[in-house]
Amino acid sequence: VHLTGEEKAAVTALWGKVNVDEVGGEALGRLLVVYPWTQRFFDSFGDLSSPDAVMGNPKVKAHGKKVLNSFSEGLKNLDNLKGTFAKLSELHCDKLHVDPENFKLLGNVLVCVLAHHFGKEFTPQVQAAYQKVVAGVANALAHKYH
């Protein structure tokens, strides 16, 4: 991902304020509600029968936190996203058979959740930088599929 120094600083500064527990659970929950076909990858998560069930599901929250912790690792290695996410790409491709388009969907949902949480602080410039990052992460996670 090519970010300017200013973009990197903006992404890093905002990310330092992110509550990964809260934002991770909300982002994954919203993905499962807005794009219900993604639920098929989470059969073991129990009740996903309604938006309230999804958003209150402790397994969704826990996995969302795990996802954002991985995303945090990516932010520390923006110049080597493919290397950073190589094992996760392999897992999601070979074992879990996740449609790589879902990585893009989750990235876009994450941007929406960040905008919701940070309001005016999430300026168009910050959003543009985050869109680059989530696209880079989605591309890195899809790398094994190519």
Swiss-Prot record:
Q: Which residues carry this modification: N6-acetyllysine?
A: 59, 82, 144
Residues with the modification S-nitrosocysteine, per the entry, are 93
Show the PROSITE patterns listed in the entry. GLOBIN
Instruction: Give the modified residues of type N-acetylvaline.
Output: 1
Q: Which residues form a coiled coil?
A: none
The source's domain of life comes to Eukaryota
Organ and tissue specificity:
Red blood cells.
Q: Under the cellular component aspect of Gene Ontology, which terms does the record hold?
A: blood microparticle; haptoglobin-hemoglobin complex; hemoglobin complex
Briefly state the protein's biological role: Involved in oxygen transport from the lung to the various peripheral tissues.
Q: How does it assemble?
A: Heterotetramer of two alpha chains and two beta chains.
What is the protein name stated in its UniProt record?
Answer: Hemoglobin subunit beta
Underlying gene: HBB
